[in-house]
Amino acid sequence: MRLFVALAPPADVLTDVDAALGPAREVQPDLRWIPVERWHLTLAFYGEVPDESLTGVIEMVARKLSRRPLPGPVELSFSGSGQFSRRALWVGVAGDVDRLRALAKSVNTDRRPYRPHLTVARLRGGQDATRAAEVLSSYAGPVWRAREVHLVRSFLGPHPRYETVSSWPVTGPAPES
């Protein structure tokens, strides 16, 4: 099974991003636009994991999160846009990005630097999403609080879908004043 750890932004925030994509979809309708119900903010990608290892992965994520709880809420917003190597069009993340990186680092097994983003479209064979990225470059969405971290299973195929396997609160106790 394919597993990843992610945040699920609130529905109203995703609706705002979706509305902002309208002009980008008009200038580049040929991109493979990802449906809103599959949008998430990936923290760590574990890839293929044997079914019998699921309990161990759940325990590992829980242990890692408990070792590095973030005090107080993590406030984020989506802002700007870009593309990754002609593979994906993304909307950027603003706000408590350093804390988001710390959260990602706590569950990540990959050594590459974490680049927070919301993938909104995939590109086919060398496509360039520059026009769509330019349209979205000035986007600044509403602020939202990350409340839960989710371990998610992805099912590939003609109709990909996601299933939340387990969830944990993002934060530890709020700091005392």
Stretch-by-stretch model annotation:
Residues M1-S177:
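Histidine-dependent nucleotide/RNA phosphoesterase domain, centered on the 2H-phosphoesterase fold
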